[in-house]
Amino acid sequence: MSGISGCPFFLWGLLALLGLALVISLIFNISHYVEKQRQDKMYSYSSDHTRVDEYYIEDTPIYGNLDDMISEPMDENCYEQMKARPEKSVNKMQEATPSAQATNETQMCYASLDHSVKGKRRKPRKQNTHFSDKDGDEQLHAIDASVSKTTLVDSFSPESQAVEENIHDDPIRLFGLIRAKREPIN
C-alpha cells in the first residue's frame, strides 16, 4: 500500500496553485464590482438615468424593438390598405362581353396558367441553313410580327395595367376568373 499513495506531490501543488489563482481572481472581481457601485452612487445625476418608461430604441430597429416603438400620429389616408376590395366584383367581370374578355386576355403579361400537355411542344429544328428569297421574306415577316408584339406590350395604358394588378389584390375574384376561363362558355 505504501507504493500507491494516490496523486504525486506536484499534482497537489498544481491543484493548490490553480485554486489560489481562482480565489484571488474572485476577490479582484468582487472588489472591482463594489468600487464601480460606489462610483455610480457618487456621480449619479437624475438626468443620466433613464426613467422606467424610457428605453433605448435604435435608429434601425431589429426584431424586438419594432413592437416597443411609440406610435406617431400619421395620416392614414396616405397608405393603401392591403385588404381593400377592387371596384369591380366577380359577377360584373363574368357578365362582361366576350370581346372585352378577349382583349383582356391578349393584354395579359403574366405567365400562362395553362399547364396542359398540349401547350408543351418541342420547337422544330432548323433543317436548311440555305434560304431562298421566299424563306427570307417569311423570316422578315416573322421578325416584324415579333416586333409588333413587343410594341403592343409597351403601348398598354396604365389603366389596363391597374385592372390587371387589381385582379391579384382579391383572391376570390382571381379564382373566379380562373374558373370562368376553365369552364367552356355555352
UniProtKB/Swiss-Prot annotation:
Keyword Transmembrane attached: yes
Basic and acidic residues biased stretches: 131-140
GO molecular function: transmembrane receptor protein tyrosine kinase adaptor activity
Topology class, membrane: Single-pass type III membrane protein
Ranges annotated as biased composition (Basic residues): 118-128
GO biological processes: adaptive immune response; cellular defense response; negative regulation of receptor recycling; negative regulation of transport; positive regulation of calcium-mediated signaling; positive regulation of T cell receptor signaling pathway; signal transduction
Extracellular side, ranges: 1-7
Tissue: Strongly expressed in thymus, and to a lesser extent in spleen, lymph node and peripheral blood lymphocytes. Present in T-cells and NK cells, but not B-cells (at protein level).
Keywords: Adaptive immunity, Cell membrane, Disulfide bond, Immunity, Membrane, Phosphoprotein, Signal-anchor, Transmembrane, Transmembrane helix
UniProt xrefs under Pfam families: SIT
Gene Ontology terms: cellular component: centriolar satellite; mitotic spindle; plasma membrane; T cell receptor complex
Subunit (UniProt): Homodimer; disulfide-linked. Interacts with CD3Z. When phosphorylated, interacts with PIK3R1.
The name this protein goes by in its record: T-cell receptor-associated transmembrane adapter 1
Taxonomic lineage of the native organism: Eukaryota, Metazoa, Chordata, Craniata, Vertebrata
Primary gene name: TRAT1
